[in-house]
C-alpha cells in the first residue's frame, strides 16, 4: 500500500507508537476552532511527585502556589531555577494531599525528572516518571463539552480538573 496515499486522508498514521500525520493542518485547525478535536499529549513528559514534603517542595520550585490546589484540580506553572529563571512551563495536577502529577510539553520525562531532582536534598519526596503507566488525551474545541455529554462522560468542573 502506498503510504503517501494514506497521508491524504484525515486521521493518524501510527508507526511504533508515534503519530506520523494527523491529516491536513486546515482540518485540524477547523476541528479545534469549530467542533471537537481529540489531542494526543502522550509525548508530554509526566512526572509523579509524592511524599509528605511534596507540596512544600513544589511550592519552592514553581510559580504557582500548589499548597492551595484541591485534589483533582490543577494549575499552569513555571519551573524556576534557584535564581528565579524560568526553566520550563508545566501543569501541576494535584492527585491527593501528598501527590502531584507534573505535565510538561517539549521535554522528555528524564529531563523533567533531572530538573526537579537537582533541588531535592533532604525532603521526603519521591519522583517517578509516568510515561509507561498512562496515556494523556485532551478533548478540545467549542463543542468538547457536548461531545463529552454525548459520550455520557462528565464535564470537568474547572480548568485542569482531572
What is the predicted role of each segment?
Residues 1-162:
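Basic, glycine/lysine-rich polyanion-binding surfaces/domains
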Amino acid at each position: 500500500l502506498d503510504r503517501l496515499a494514506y497521508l491524504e486522508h484525515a486521521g493518524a498514521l501510527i508507526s511504533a507508537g508515534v503519530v506520523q500525520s494527523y491529516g491536513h493542518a486546515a482540518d485540524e485547525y477547523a476541528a479545534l476552532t469549530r467542533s471537537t478535536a481529540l489531542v494526543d499529549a502522550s509525548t508530554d513528559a509526566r512526572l509523579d511527585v509524592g511524599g509528605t514534603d511534596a507540596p512544600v517542595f513544589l511550592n519552592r520550585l514553581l510559580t504557582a502556589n500548589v499548597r492551595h490546589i484541591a485534589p483533582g484540580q490543577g494549575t499552569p506553572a513555571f519551573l524556576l531555577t534557584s535564581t528565579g529563571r524560568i526553566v520550563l512551563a508545566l501543569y501541576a495536577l494535584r492527585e491527593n494531599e501528598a501527590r502531584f502529577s507534573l505535565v510538561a510539553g517539549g521535554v522528555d520525562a528524564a529531563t523533567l525528572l533531572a530538573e526537579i531532582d537537582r533541588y531535592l536534598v533532604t525532603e521526603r519526596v519521591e519522583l517517578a516518571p509516568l510515561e509507561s503507566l498512562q496515556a494523556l488525551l485532551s478533548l478540545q474545541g467549542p463543542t468538547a463539552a457536548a461531545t463529552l455529554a454525548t459520550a455520557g462522560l462528565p464535564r470537568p468542573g474547572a480548568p485542569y480538573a482531572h
